[in-house]
Amino acid sequence: MYNDIWSAYNNIFTRIGLDFRSIIADAGAMGGRESIEFIAISDVGEDTIAYSEESDYAANIEMASSKFKERTNTEVQLQKEVVDTPATTTIEDLASFLDVKESKILKSVLFVADGNKPILAIVRGDHEVNEIKVRMAVGAETIETASEAHIEDLFGNIPAGYVGPVDLSEEVTIVADLYVKNMVNSV
């Protein structure tokens, strides 16, 4: 039945000459892990999609994935060092203060899944955390950015921008983007 419906939409849009893609999309809390949507290709609109001209891959930006290439890093591993970073509340501030590229910084964002489960998501500093992908990675129904009060309950008097993956409570689940795997001597 699904294939018949998909074919019907595909045939209609093809017949009228619409430049379109069937894309991988988020089905939301009620719809399972993913769904397929038909999207017209346009310079305007409410959605951003990633697609390939060489294949039939297409997804909305929340569901898009890239091909991860593991790299052999020849950088010499330095000793871990504690550095005071006063008044650096953003990735941009930290990169400027330490004179490093944003891609060398680990960005950590704390979420609360299903109302009470702390999740720490980690990406490169020049990337953004995708809440939908975090929700799907931990199998949660709902996810939201942790409030200041929730952060204080878990970590004490640590500002949100200073929470990181070191010495965490076992109750915190850590989810990291694959690109973090290639990072050496990160901040």
Where are these regions (language model features)?
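Extended, low-hydrophobicity, polar/charged segments
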Residues: 1-187
